[in-house]
Amino acid sequence: SAASDVYKRQTDDRIVLPEEINGLPVVSAAPYAFSAHKDGEEDAETWESEDAFSFGEDRLLAGEEVQEIVFPDTLKEIGRYIFYGCKKLERLEFSDTLMQVGTGAFTGCSGLKELVIHQKKGIKSCAKEILGELWQKIDVDFLYENGEASGKRAHMVFPEHYDEAVENTPARILFTEYHGSGTNYRQCFYSKELDFAEYDSLFDMAVVMDKLEVLVDMSFGRLCHPWQLSKKAKKQYEDYIRGNLKDIGEFLVESGSLNGLELLSREKLWNREGLEHSIDVASGKKDMEISAFLMNERSRMQKEEQKVAGETENDGRPVKRRKKFQL
């Protein structure tokens, strides 16, 4: 049977549910379980974590108290409106055992930013059902732990999408204006499996509809974890980065993303203009660590240019041959 109506009382805002509670396997979570709008909460059983730390006040973790939840591998379904009103929920981690998602489960979860899915059985998941309830940008990490993909990771970014009514006053009409390419990206699932090729094929649309920081996350995520990334798609992301290197470099420096700058070096995506601009930005920001990294990259690039120039010069130089004399 399911331990489906158990709540956790502790002082941490991170909830890690066990596989068993009171000897019962945790296979489902009840409707409204973590919602601030639970019905009949006074009848619910309260589970207190053994590793909870008390600071003089226990809190029932629900509603805006919830920031991160880790579901056990045994969980198969979550009930309707389970996270209703959990505005501060940011991260959700679960396995591909979870396949059933109740209606409105993520209503009001405007702060959710990250899903981590442990693919223990195969490549199917409930990601599409969850993403379908969320309009904001969501990062999804698929961690493959079985079969030929075991040990692989895919970091997939699903952009935001929303529409708004815009008034054309002279014509006295309203029309709908759409923002973000997220609607299209959320349709890249078939039979609960993500179609990587279709996902990658939408990037040209994203370039037109989404912001620079989103495009950086998307392209860098695919290059850093290139599971199911074709040569054509890889070149597409690389071409975008090279074509916008000044803006991307500035964004990475301003946001303090040394990992992003290191990826540009590792994938050999720097050009002289983009690197020099990034150095100027880092200098103005007085970020010593990033400045040192970029200066080292400049030195490395100069050495490579000198090496290439030397090889070119040698290739163009006529070869001296010994003259033969007949005595």
What are the residue ranges of the model-derived segments?
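Structural signature of tandem-repeat unit edges
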Residues: 1, 9-27, 39-77, 87-100, ...
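Repeat-mediated protein-protein interaction surfaces in helical alpha-solenoids
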Residues: 221-237, 259-261
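Conserved hydrophobic site in ankyrin repeats
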Residues: 263-264, 294
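Charge-dense, extended regions
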Residues: 280-327
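Short, charge-rich amphipathic alpha-helical segments embedded
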Residues: 266-281
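C-terminal per-repeat helix/turn "cap" of leucine-rich repeat
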Residues: 33, 59, 81-82, 105
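Active-site loops and adjacent core secondary-structure elements that bind or stabilize anionic groups
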Residues: 6
